[in-house]
């Protein structure tokens, strides 16, 4: 069942554009806090098309990575450019990396929003495909599949889940 769900999510987004982090779509203003299986983040909408944030990711083999990032809405909030700086990348030739990428989100359907992201840094690449669900009163649920590919070492991939609160 999970394999079919993951395949369906990838198929829905693959036709839009080539496809990691959970792509949240903030309203015109606000702050979003989230915690997931492998990460915690906080982000804020600072301009109508720009969001900045901080993310802490727990990597099995590579320690706890910190990222400071920004997203820029290119086409509404459905296509976003992603960029940032990540540190504490263990076992790499350098422990820091600037990165950039793209995020694509489909329109909401019955409170569900599929998305996919791809980011590439000088020492890693990461993809994520997932599904956001708006529960109520600013609360949301996220289910995703991520694939973290370091320059040196083994890939880390798996299914994750998380909750988000927008205020």
Each predicted region: which residue ranges?
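Outer-membrane beta-barrel "beta-signal"
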Residues: 154-167
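Transmembrane beta-strands of outer-membrane beta-barrel proteins
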Residues: 28-36, 53-57, 82-86, 115-119, ...
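Membrane-embedded beta-strand positions in outer-membrane beta-barrel channels/transporters
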Residues: 39-43, 67-69, 99-101, 128, ...
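Repeated loop/turn-to-beta-strand initiation elements of outer-membrane beta-barrel proteins
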Residues: 48-54, 75-83, 107-114, 135-143
């Amino acid at each position: 069942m999970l394999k079919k769900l993951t395949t369906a999510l990838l198929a829905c987004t693959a036709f839009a554009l080539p496809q990691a982090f959970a792509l949240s779509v903030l309203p015109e203003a606000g702050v979003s806090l989230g915690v997931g299986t492998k990460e915690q983040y906080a982000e804020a909408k600072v301009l109508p098309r720009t969001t900045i944030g901080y993310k802490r990711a727990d990597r099995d083999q590579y320690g706890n990575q910190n990222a400071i990032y920004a997203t820029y809405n290119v086409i509404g909030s459905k296509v976003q450019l992603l960029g940032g700086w990540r540190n504490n990348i263990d076992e790499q030739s350098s422990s820091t990396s600037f990165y950039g990428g793209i995020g694509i989100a489909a329109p909401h359907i019955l409170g569900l929003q599929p998305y996919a992201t791809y980011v590439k840094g000088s020492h890693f690449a990461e993809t994520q495909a997932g599904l956001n669900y708006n529960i109520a009163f600013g609360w949301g649920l996220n289910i995703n599949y991520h694939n973290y590919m370091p320059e040196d070492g083994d890939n880390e991939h798996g299914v994750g889940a998380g909750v988000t609160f927008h205020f």
